[in-house]
């Protein structure tokens, strides 16, 4: 899990050197997008696979795919090969994300999972901090290719440990004939879901950046995505027995609330993570590495909130209060970020980040816990895959939205400023443009840029506030499984009866 989390951030500081070597400035966006497209599109599919095949061997195959694609990316002779390697890497990452949380479900008792998930949350925070530092170190002192090669020895050790020590009983369906498993894989749904998700993400990546939103390519992609995803939903309803996302899962109150909370938390969070460093670089004149250091208060407080939240959850049992408190703190922290001025001091931007980070640490693991506590064990892999899908989708949608809002606001606010070339802003050169302006004009442009970024933070505030609704809608279940109450994990009979009834109907 650490390798996959690290892989998302380690490349950031290496990209300039990669573009210099491959002369591929126009391909920069695809180094991240190719990974995101396959990882997001296949997340729900892996949730289904883990319910049918051996958890241990599916995870091992996923790591092997991740390792092979890392080797391909590291040895890439050109930009195209690197993009292909990143796309295959996303396939392995999708399997690893789902596999690790499924292993936790099988190995760790429910009442101890909050602490484990808190540790994983801390791991994600640490990877966000050290990833760019490691990537910069490899790029400066060895070669950017070691950003990928580092996965090989570490992943090899992980595979060996899993092979020898991980003991997970096979699913009942693991012994079924391969032909029967393939029938259960929801081929019609997969054929609709994967291209539908890819079309949606491509439209969001291209819209307003590569092409205007009115461009025929973007409109066609959005239309096709809508048709395919509606078709996928219809298949899930009409063929529930083999559905990738059975309707009974989405009808469960806590799962629906958790999905909403996950989506909205990540929509707002990725706005902060992506645009806060831009504020430091453009408004405060920080370098790329300095802006990373200045976001440490957010990352460290998130790690602290995640660990303390997991410990507290284990003691009190109930996770809903943590979700409510956490999302409320996020709202306050995000709201304060929208008050940034050009001369905002360190005390404020550090304090605002700490407030937001603590809330994020308390809240962002709760949807996964709610899913595990609310679903029968056989449905947990699918439920967790849904949460991961919502995470990736939220990140994609709102980073794209934020980029468009920033570009539009900059054009609107700087169009009348003398000496400002609007074409440089729309091509992504606003920060360097500010530094080249005369002092008098620069002050005006700086205020305009700050106002534009505040608008972006306001965009992130909307889903952050909406996440409180998802947190409040969660059922009050305890991970301690109080005596006399049957937990969702022990409700296998109920689910089997539902499956039996569904089979008879079909």
Swiss-Prot record:
The chain crosses the membrane at residues 22-42, 45-65, 88-108, 118-138, 146-166, 187-207, 218-238, 260-280, 292-312, 322-342, 349-369, 380-400, 456-476. Residues 481-506 are annotated as: Disordered. It is found in: Membrane. Keywords: Glycoprotein, Membrane, Transmembrane, Transmembrane helix, Transport. It is a multi-pass membrane protein. GO terms for cellular component: plasma membrane. Residues 487-506 have a biased composition (Basic and acidic residues). It comes from the Eukaryota. Pfam families: MFS_1. Glycans are attached at residues 78, 141. GO terms for molecular function: transmembrane transporter activity. InterPro entries: MFS, MFS_dom, MFS_trans_sf. MFS-type transporter; part of the gene cluster that mediates the biosynthesis of the tetrahydroxanthone dimer neosartorin, which exhibits antibacterial activity. Belongs to the major facilitator superfamily. TCR/Tet family. This is MFS-type transporter nsrN. It comes from Aspergillus novofumigatus (strain IBT 16806).
């Amino acid at each position: 899990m650490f390798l996959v989390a690290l892989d998302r951030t380690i490349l950031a500081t290496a990209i300039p050197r990669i573009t210099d070597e491959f002369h591929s400035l126009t391909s920069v966006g695809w180094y991240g997008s190719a990974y995101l497209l396959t990882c997001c599109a296949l997340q729900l599919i892996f949730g289904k696979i883990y319910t049918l095949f051996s958890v241990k061997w599916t995870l091992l195959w996923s790591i092997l795919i991740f390792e092979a694609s890392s080797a391909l990316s590291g040895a890439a002779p050109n930009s195209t090969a690197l993009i292909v390697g990143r796309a295959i890497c996303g396939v392995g990452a999708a399997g690893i994300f789902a596999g690790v949380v499924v292993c936790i479900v099988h190995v760790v008792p429910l009442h101890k999972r909050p602490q484990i998930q808190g540790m994983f949350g801390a791991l994600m925070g640490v990877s966000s901090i050290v990833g760019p530092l490691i990537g910069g170190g490899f790029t400066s002192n060895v070669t950017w290719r070691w950003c990928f090669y580092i996965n090989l020895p570490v992943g090899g050790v992980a595979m060996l440990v899993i092979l020898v020590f991980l003991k997970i009983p096979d699913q009942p369906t693991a012994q079924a004939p391969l032909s029967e498993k393939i029938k259960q894989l929801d081929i019609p749904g997969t054929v609709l879901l994967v291209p539908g998700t890819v079309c949606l993400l491509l439209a969001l990546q291209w819209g307003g950046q590569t092409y205007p939103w009115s461009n025929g390519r973007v409109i066609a992609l959005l239309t096709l995505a809508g048709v395919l995803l509606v078709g996928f939903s219809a298949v899930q309803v009409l063929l529930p027995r083999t559905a990738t996302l059975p309707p009974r899962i989405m009808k469960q109150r806590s799962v629906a609330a958790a999905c909403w909370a996950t989506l909205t938390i990540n929509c707002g969070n990725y706005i902060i993570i992506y645009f806060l460093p831009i504020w430091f670089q453009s408004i405060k004149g920080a370098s790329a590495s300095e802006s990373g250091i200045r976001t440490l208060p957010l990352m460290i407080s998130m790690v602290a909130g995640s660990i303390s939240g997991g410990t507290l959850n284990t003691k009190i049992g109930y996770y809903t209060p943590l979700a409510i408190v956490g999302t409320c703190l996020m709202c306050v922290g995000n709201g304060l970020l929208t008050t940034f001025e050009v001369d905002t001091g360190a005390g404020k931007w550090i304090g605002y980040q700490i407030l937001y980070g603590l809330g994020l640490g308390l809240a962002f693991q709760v949807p996964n816990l709610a899913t595990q506590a609310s679903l029968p064990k056989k449905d947990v892999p699918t439920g967790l895959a849904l949460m991961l899908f919502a995470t990736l989708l939220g990140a994609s949608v709102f980073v794209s939205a934020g980029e468009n809002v920033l570009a539009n606001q900059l054009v609107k606010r700087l169009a009348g400023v003398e000496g400002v070339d609007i074409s440089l802003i729309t091509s992504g050169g606003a920060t360097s443009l500010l530094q080249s302006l005369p002092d008098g004009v620069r002050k005006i442009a700086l205020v305009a840029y700050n106002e534009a970024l505040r608008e972006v933070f306001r965009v992130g505030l909307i889903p952050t506030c909406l996440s409180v609704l998802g947190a409040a809608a969660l059922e009050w279940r305890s991970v301690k499984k109080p005596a006399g109450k049957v937990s969702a994990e022990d409700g296998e009979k109920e689910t089997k009866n539902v499956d039996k009834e569904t089979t008879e109907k079909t």
